[in-house]
Amino acid sequence: MVARVWSLMRFLIKGSVAGGAVYLVYDQELLGPSDKSEAALRKAEEVVPPAMYQFSQYVCQQTGLEMPQLPTPPKIKFPNFRDSWNSGIISVMSALSVAPSKAREYSKEGWEYLKEHSK
């Protein structure tokens, strides 16, 4: 009985995390224009390091352990982030769109090869 409840709890937790991630992406319009994605990236660069520091300080206070000071993350500049992002998305989507026809073509070639060499 406990195993079933634990399994259900794990499923609900994973589903909640996945649903929250989908909601966040939709709410922040990260799949929309590149300007929104760039703004979200800049916001994350500003917010995440202080939050990690505060969380590590909280853990140290609660547990009595001392964590070593982490090095500061390097500053990464994305001058043409928009172009790279868009070209990556276009490449992936075009590959996905031709995948069924390519799979059919390759399977046909493979079948012909097997027929030739099995004689």
UniProtKB/Swiss-Prot annotation:
Membrane topology, Mitochondrial intermembrane segments: 27-119
Keywords in alphabetical order: Membrane, Mitochondrion, Mitochondrion inner membrane, Transmembrane, Transmembrane helix
Listed InterPro entries: Mic13 (IPR026769)
Subcellular location: Mitochondrion inner membrane
Signal peptide boundaries: none
Mitochondrial matrix side: 1-7
Protein name: MICOS complex subunit MIC13
